[in-house]
Amino acid sequence: MSVVIKEVTSKKELKKFVKFNIELYKGNPYHVPGLIEEEMVTLDKKKNPAFEVCDAIYFLAYRDGKVVGRIAGMINRRSNETWNQKYARFGFVDFIDDAEVVDALFDAVEKWAKEQGMDALHGPMGFTDMDHEGMLIEGFDQIGTMATIYNYPYYPKQMERMGYTKDQDWHEFKIYIPDGVPEKHLRIGEIVKKKYGLKVMKFKNAKSIMPYAQKVFRTLNE
């Protein structure tokens, strides 16, 4: 039976959207699912402050009445203005290993992006650059971390089949923290601080950090 694409328009459908990721990876020892309620809030246009600068649409793919894929289309207007671009993002994307399903999902989000006046689609991304980004292409036998998105090996293969190309590589490293900072590193740290007039700031509470928040985010964006 053919694939049917439906836009998510109710809370019930949104929960299906969230739970599909959990169902698809059920039994996978390396996948760490998100918390359902937390994901619901993230995708809720009335609760996530990102929607002050973002637009979004969610799609579910059905076959024989069963959910077989999901995808979100997003536009971060502020990011587009900052970088003078017309980019739509795709994210929260999951699907069974089926070309018909994948094509239908991306056809839907590509059509939406064009209708919004966008000329490019990139992802997987979140609403902002502080959200999870990227698609796993190696390390499928490693437990996913809080900074990454875990996916099956067939995901990048399906993306390449459709003609999508890789933008850049991100590498993740495991670092073992010693009991104490090596003396050599302490000496180098002191030299660098004196040379550039640097100082380490210690904050007692969240309120004391706020005056520096904009500078921190500006540095991250740069």
Predicted segments — roles?
Residues L14, V67, R77-N80, D129-D131, ...:
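Flexible loop/turn segments at secondary-structure boundaries
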Residues D44-L60:
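A short helix-loop-beta-strand connector motif used in the catalytic cores of GNAT acetyltransferases and
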Residues M1-K46, Y196-E222:
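Short amphipathic alpha-helix that is part of the acyltransferase structural core
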Residues I149-E222:
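Acyltransferase donor/substrate-recognition loop-hinge adjacent to the catalytic core
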Residues A56-I71, E160, K166-D169:
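Conserved beta-hairpin
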Residues F20-N21, Y25, E52-A56, R70:
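Membrane-embedded alpha-helical bundles of multi-pass transporters/translocases
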Residues E81-Q168:
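Acyl-donor binding region in acyl/amide transferases
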